[in-house]
Amino acid sequence: MANSPHGGVLKDLLARDAPRHDELAAEAETLPAIVLSERQLCDLELIMNGGFSPLEGFMTQKDFDGVCENCRLADGHLFSMPITLDASQQVISDSNLKPGSRVTLRDFRDDRNLAILTIEDIYRADKEKEAKLVFGGDPEHPAIKYLNTKVEDFYIGGKIEAVNKLNHYDYVALRYSPAELRVHFDKLGWTRVVAFQTRNPMHRAHRELTVRAARARQANVLIHPVVGLTKPGDIDHFTRVRAYQALLPRYPNGMAVLGLLPLAMRMGGPREAIWHAIIRKNHGATHFIVGRDHAGPGKNSKGEEFYGPYDAQHAVEKYREELGIEVVEFQQVTYLPDTDEYKPKDEVPAGIKTLDISGTELRNRLRTGAHIPEWFSYPEVVKILRESSPPRATQGFTIFLTGYMNSGKDAIARALQVTLNQQGGRSVTLLLGDTVRHELSSELGFSAEDRHTNVQRIAFVAGELTRAGAAVIAAPIAPYERSRKAAREAVSGLGGSFFLVHVNTPLEYCEKTDKRGIYAKARRGEIKGFTGVDDPYEAPENADLVVDVSKQSVRSIVHEIILMLESEGYFDRL
């Protein structure tokens, strides 16, 4: 029999509210609506299907404060991650939302009504408390970045009535709700289930450690990867799921099943490990593997880990009895070539030869097309990874030129376009500042916010083209550091490489060589908000390349850019 849910009762709101579907659906059409973001959709799905039991809605302030301060809901239940619905003051005011109001929660993807929320309270989001107590306070932490840049200023708490399931069009047969997975376990006759959480592809070592964990406990394996939001730069879930499916036949017959979890990860380390254990308990698992630096975001810009390597294991162990799910500590295994087997590192005698490939080395081999040995990963898995991660010489990239008007950006961009077209191998797209203003941003002015929006539109186009394998050359003025950082994140977040080139031509030179007289007009006050005259240009903090047309020829600058790309592997090496 599957493990009992957290809190004793599976809060399957979809099943609970199904008899009232027509009534709720009709009411939802008459209510004001909040259109949910991708992360909010992930949270709502797991609230409605019981994955977040005992939650029945988004957290009130009492729940939020208790979870942040003590990992406790207001009713005393253990819960480690704030699950909140953020909204702007404008949305709240426009819809006249207040305690007691009912509001429809709507899917941004297809405009479907998903649920009705009865508002219990509206409270200001204490982002500082959440950042410090839940995630550790480092402003570079991805969850804290999200808090500070994406989350609105108010949280809305209240219980939910389910109207419709979210629509999914990928891997539908693998998207088990907690109730469905419990039925599946019963059908298979499984009573002991070891759940394995992952957001990465699995290789032979992962197969070995999960089999060992199951064998030691006379259990079966639930491979339960996250297919919601993970860490920026992770391999997309389509590729990962194909790789998991290819791996599944390598398990002993009937030992493992694959189920997909639509979770929006926060990369919250110890707090997240407790949360993951609760979620797996709700899905019926009796055991849960917690790895080294479980759900950690890696290192900050100083090379420091956000969490200690065993903080997550210690956190889950602290609440072992209350969680009601047995923690299985992730064993680091290594390959022994002399005996062609994997063993836990702490069981390998001194002097025995071992082999390992790090994640960084694997990415490098995928990037360069270098051999990936069968002792590390199965050929069918490697084939799938290579299909989605072609060698860098065939990948796209974005060259983002920034500098004053008339600094030489356009000349460099055009010359670079010709050079790359001559090189061949990928399509080349040119996004000049004036062209973008005319074709994409004609309605925008030159306020700070409009300039930021213009750069983000460029980044969106560049990211999509780069992901498709094109070379993109963008050449806006882009005077603000926050806009350039956001552009880099947008392109990198889609898996593309972004190179920031600061065309650091002095303002005096730009003015002196301005044949159109634009600077002169700005000096006379005929043009307002002109970069370098009455609006600042913030020099980039971390440019990949700095050039200067007053000291270098366009030809030599283009050569520098080509050399930079060549050193990063973007051209075939004979």
Curated annotation (Swiss-Prot):
GO terms for molecular function: adenylylsulfate kinase activity; ATP binding; sulfate adenylyltransferase (ATP) activity. It holds the Pfam family ATP-sulfurylase. The active site is at T198, R199, N200. Residues 395-574 are annotated as: Allosteric regulation domain. 3'-phosphoadenylyl sulfate binds at D434, T435, V436, R437, R451, I477, A478, R516. ATP binds at Q197, T198, R199, N200, G291, R292, D293, H294, V333. It catalyses: sulfate + ATP + H(+) = adenosine 5'-phosphosulfate + diphosphate. Its main location: cytoplasm. It is found in: Cytoplasm. Keywords: Allosteric enzyme, Amino-acid biosynthesis, ATP-binding, Cysteine biosynthesis, Cytoplasm, Methionine biosynthesis, Nucleotide-binding, Nucleotidyltransferase, Transferase. Pathway: Sulfur metabolism; hydrogen sulfide biosynthesis; sulfite from sulfate: step 1/3. The record marks H203, H206 as: Transition state stabilizer. The keyword Nucleotide-binding applies. One of its GO terms (biological process) is sulfate assimilation, phosphoadenylyl sulfate reduction by phosphoadenylyl-sulfate reductase (thioredoxin). Catalyzes the first intracellular reaction of sulfate assimilation, forming adenosine-5'-phosphosulfate (APS) from inorganic sulfate and ATP. Plays an important role in sulfate activation as a component of the biosynthesis pathway of sulfur-containing amino acids. Homohexamer. Dimer of trimers. In the N-terminal section; belongs to the sulfate adenylyltransferase family. The adenylyl-sulfate kinase (APS kinase) is non-functional. It is involved in allosteric regulation by PAPS. PAPS binding induces a large rotational rearrangement of domains lowering the substrate affinity of the enzyme. This is Sulfate adenylyltransferase. It comes from Aspergillus terreus (strain NIH 2624 / FGSC A1156).
